[in-house]
Curated annotation (Swiss-Prot):
Species whose genome carries this gene: Emericella nidulans (strain FGSC A4 / ATCC 38163 / CBS 112.46 / NRRL 194 / M139)
Sequence ranges of Basic and acidic residues compositional bias: 490-507
Protein name, per record: Peptidyl-prolyl cis-trans isomerase-like 2
BP GO terms, sorted: protein folding; protein ubiquitination
Keywords: Isomerase, Nucleus, Rotamase, Transferase, Ubl conjugation pathway
SMART domains: Ubox
Amino acid sequence: MGKGTDKLYITHSEWASEDAYSASAGAGVGKARRGVGEASFKRLPFRFCSLSLQPFEHPVCTQSGTIFDLTSILPWIKKHGTNPVDGTPLKGSDLIKLTIAKNDAGEYIDPVTYKVLTDNTHVVALRNTGNVFAWDTIERLNIKGKMWRDLVSDEEFTRKDIITLQDPQNIESRDLSRFNHIKEGESGLSDEQLREREDPSRNVNVNALGSSAKILKAREAVAKARQERAQKAGNAASTPVAKTDAPVKSAQKTASYQSGKPVPYNAARYTTGLAAASFTSTGMTPHTSAELALLSDEDYMLKRGRVKQKGYARISTTSGDINLELHTEYAPKAVWNFIKLAKKGYYKDVTFHRNIKGFMIQGGDPTGTGRGGESIWGKYFNDEFEGPLKHDSRGTLSMANKGKNTNSSQFFIAYRALPHLNLKHTIFGHVIDDPTPSSPTLNKLETHPVNPTTNRPTPDIRIVDVTIFVDPFEEFLKQKKQSEQSAENEANRTAENDEEGSRRAEDDQITWTGKRVRGPGASKEESSTTVGKYLKAALSERAAHDEDEIVEFVDEEPTSEPAKKKFKGIGGFGDFSSWD
């Protein structure tokens, strides 16, 4: 017998479960909820550039086999200096020019077998020549035949010169959802391409529109004129925002984003929610306008990429000094935490409680046990893994943690490359002692005797003090204050010039006898209190907006007004003489 609570239909919770798989839920919805990448997989075709996502015309590739268009990747490298796909450093000299054969139909083919290179073809290129082949051709004619010469140019190559451009068995390398520049929302198109894409008439044949083409051209001219006037008005109305030297505390302030009012530099992308709360609760003070929340100076600066200046510090230990470079651009929270704790004197007389030769040295715990320490906020803060920083060299400075998002005050310095720690520990600095990275102090710390059971240095290695040479956050605030001060001075000078000009104009209206001459706006002022003042104001306002009219560009012949027909009257009233 069934239970009384059994439903004769599928409930909402069953549809929304992780195991849901049907036409209504959609294939792969369970994988999407669990974070599996297959649900959002989007494959980049072979003939497309990995940056502009458009068909390439001048193909080049990297050492890892990522294909770009030369006209798209060079401006990116000049601006960012990284590989837009994986975020690793990239130079223009690292690019390899590709030579891909085409058939009469314009399709890319193998130059030997004339096989068309599709999205499912295993495609490779030779590093020294740049010629592109199908993998079957290289395998049958070169590898199995032990003939290590380019089949087109007859140049020698080795197995290491073979670069895989596309492998149908490894389609993850062409997954758009994994591209770094797409994750960060950065476009690979040039400014000219963006303007062309945003142009609504880019696919319209203007020459075939006849007289309507003049209307489109006039509309474009009017839009351009409006944009120029808006820019001039915005530059004239913008005023600097006052800011104090001391950081604002966590209490949020608000700012209205009504039209015509400048938005503060630290305005958040979300509102305070007071309008919605007062609408749904009678206990709230009524608010009729949405107000943007203001971020504190700390929250404003700790956004990744906001402060790009490097920080510099020195750790003085009982075994010597270690000079550090702090990567504020990629790990602002970790750098802020380290600098604030150092200025607070938190690391003074703190021991390095763990030292493993060939691995790393760890410290920053005031208790000396490895289980203590807290951040400047008094709680754990999140990891910062976005960026090109890796544990790829000796002297890397990273945060120690107990798991995901458990960073506090402890840090460690690596003695070698530790790739297994990537995406597990936040990298926020590097040792810059000369000769880098094998500093004498770091070598001395690595060879320091330790307890083989606990890996604790014997005798203890203590941090005498941490000196901050360059605080990037203070420099950022100083530069911002100077720019605001200069903008304020410029606004004051403009206001003084305007006031002086108006005073001179007023003086010109008074004669040497003391009589005031009627100015050009006097008649308007006198008539402002007379009958019909609102009608005149409306007419003047309408005339001010007449400059955007475009009807004058319509090329049509005027039509003459039809002549009125003459009405033939039937005469006046009769005298009834015709009546019998």
